[in-house]
Amino acid sequence: MGRILQFSDVHFGCEHKHACAAALDYAHATPNDLVLITGDITQKGFPDEFTAAGEWMRAMPEPRFVIVGNHDVPYWDAVARVLHPWRAFETATGFPAHDGQFLGKDVMVRGVVTARGWQARPNWSKGVIDLDQTRRAAEALRQAPIGALRILACHHPLIEMVGTPMTGDVKRGDEAALIFAEAGVDLIMTGHVHVPFAMPIPLADRCSYAVGCGTLSHRERGAPPGFNQIDWDAKTITVTAQAWDGSSYRSHQVWRLPRRQDTRNAATAPSPVEPGALEKAFLPDAKP
């Protein structure tokens, strides 16, 4: 029924040039419904990095949807980090940093920002998701068309992955993941850790999954440069991690995920107007 190509952590400034060029060729040779880029398009947020990233993204087939990552803030510009951390990203990509959304024939994607220009903790690379943003995203997911694949896209994994080389350490991430699952999300698609993964979100017996993407940079963390191809039909979501072997892309890992069925029927889908129990519990101001 559909296909998405997910790229992440290209990190222009230390990008893998051959892998990036081959990714463009792959995207144009492979029919798809959306090219999704989940943040960290630059390494230090320098103007020339944003220029290169923008050119690469605009060379991708349409439609495209791009969200921001923690490396997409001007690293050495303290004023920009505090006052307008995402201006350069928005100028380069043409996409808003906050509350972006894509609606296709069979898929809906909602973007949220988990990166910050600065934080009240030493490691600013870690993630944060705020309550208002969670509320707006949950409402959007609940209102997705019946039968559409529902995706929440952000840069940091909302729940911690076992065995990955680093963490997202997202403030309020566990709660947000459960709220989004309750709201009907099929996939929470992320980057940041530079290795691919797919795992279920633990909420009752529903089939919502966290899916992570590798990197197209030289900042490898135990996995070759690569990206994800997501194919789905009425019953199954197939996540294929494509890996660069030095000359071409090959299938590196495959996950076949049973697709949740409640969102395919109006009688069983989450209410588009009434917040769920977890949404009400974690977000006290949630209102129908």
State where each predicted segment sits.
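N-terminal active-site segment of His-dependent metallophosphoesterases
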Residues: 1-59, 75-76, 136, 143
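Conserved beta-sheet core of the metallophosphoesterase superfamily
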Residues: 162-238
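Extended active-site neighborhood of metal-dependent phosphoesterases/phosphodiesterases
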Residues: 51-139, 144, 179-181, 229
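Beta-strand-turn-beta hairpins that frame and shape the catalytic cleft
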Residues: 1-5, 100-111, 142-149, 202-209
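A short C-terminal boundary segment appended to hydrolase-like catalytic domains
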Residues: 232-288
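Active-site environment of divalent metal-dependent phosphoester hydrolases
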Residues: 13-15, 43-48, 70-78, 116-123, ...
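Short acidic, glycine-rich surface-loop motifs adjacent to enzyme active sites
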Residues: 141-161
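Active-site neighborhood of phospho(di)ester-bond hydrolases with catalytic His/Asp-centered motifs
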Residues: 6-8, 35-40, 64-70, 151-154, ...
